[in-house]
């Protein structure tokens, strides 16, 4: 069987992303193993608060093929972050953690030739700090990708906008 995992960066630790993740991991439509990059401590705190009972498989080797990956467990690459509570107010305190998660993800994507990547939400004001229009541009720059697309997906519809985060006055120039 071809090794083709989905790599997920949880993003802002104080968002609802992990709650959504916990609800989606048992979806039968997901055929590929999922590998989550997040904090084990945060994961355990939020699992306890949300009463989620799922085993966690810690992945230690960045060469993913050398690890056991399970479909029935949360495959986690731990990034150090020490919250005191499961949910706190969103602030710039989590920027270093988010940055470390993305750096690790980019390294793993390059090393393992990962083709499926999902990122959780981030706060543009605190994390991107006006250096990038959005997370799509941040990821593109870090991975040195010139042509990118966002995919917005739900049960009813999948949409890929013609442009990414772009002020309206520049849209016409970008699509010509």
Go through each PLM region and give its residues.
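Anion-binding alpha/beta catalytic cores of soluble intermediary-metabolism enzymes, centered on
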Residues: 1-176
